[in-house]
Curated annotation (Swiss-Prot):
UniProtKB keywords: Membrane, Transmembrane, Transmembrane helix
Transmembrane segments: 37-57, 64-86, 101-123, 143-163, 169-189, 235-255, 264-284
Cell location: Membrane
Major localisation: membrane
Database matches in PANTHER family: SERPENTINE RECEPTOR CLASS EPSILON-13-RELATED, SERPENTINE RECEPTOR, CLASS E (EPSILON)-RELATED
Gene source species: Caenorhabditis elegans
Protein known as: Serpentine receptor class epsilon-8
Gene Ontology BP terms: sensory perception of chemical stimulus
Source organism, top-level taxon: Eukaryota
Keyword Ligase part of the UniProt annotation: no
Annotated Pfam families: Sre (PF03125)
Amino acid sequence: MCSPSTSDVRFITFVNTTYIEAEGLEAIFDLLLKIEVGFLVFSWIEFLYLFYLFIFIRSMHFNLTFLFMNYGGQYFCSMLSRCIIVYQQLGNDPNNDLHNWILVANFARTVCLFIAMYILPIFMIERCLASFFVKNYEKSRKIWVSLMILSIFHPLVFASAIAYIQCWIPVVVHVISFFIVNIIGYIGIHICYSYNIKKHRKFYSPQCISRVTYGLSERFQLAENIKMCKVLKKVQISILFFNIGCCSILLMDHFQVKMMIIYWSYVCFNFFALVYGITVPIILYSALPEWQKETRRLLNLCIGRRNVGEEPKSTFGEQMIYNDHAIESNIYFTQFNKTTH
């Protein structure tokens, strides 16, 4: 629903505080805003630590890291925009000096939320390309992959966000588009995972081992594809769940209901988006042992405790038991020599 109060433009979860005051709900609204501030503070701390892990701890391929940092970048802009909006809504701008900044913040937040809602397919495309270039993807950064994905993704999302803001397309069309894109991204990762599993098993078949038709780098990349598809499947479930919830709330703009009901749905959306932004990094963290190891190292450093060595694990993070290290080493290098001679 385009609002006359916003010059015939539509922003995601734009709440007119004048209407809230007229309804006598200012105290409740202010309380909810203060609770939201608490969530925002936690989100900032979480974001800064996540950024540190992305920069200094290599836990995935460069392209996947770059795409996740792009995902985090939109959340940073979204949080910054939301902080400006909340600051004004808490009554810190009685003379409306921040009017232009509020419009910019609403515009930026709407665009960033569109990026978050369309994000799933970019991870799917990156993993599909990693599967296609399996022979040398890990050895080469292939920066062009992430740049190509983002150069196509951002203009399309930006155009969609502008169409939403300018009321060129009905809300229901945007919501249907969100659903379709998210489902395609979710199914695509499952297909990519199944393909890599099948190919990985084929490489370990007796016929393939005897013919030695694969290289160690290719086998490693396949294992890496499978591992990261597992990680993405966990992250995707949370993204899909929250995207469906947020998109469903946006449908309130499509129906003729009381303005107060719409505003309460917007409040729910804001909290839903915050929980979304807090939960996804936690799920990603829980799926990456490298990040967990770095966190333990930092905690031990803070409390002055010596870091404890860890038992070796397999490619897929499973515990490995060595009864005789010499025998295990001989087996490994025997297999290595077979593939190189």
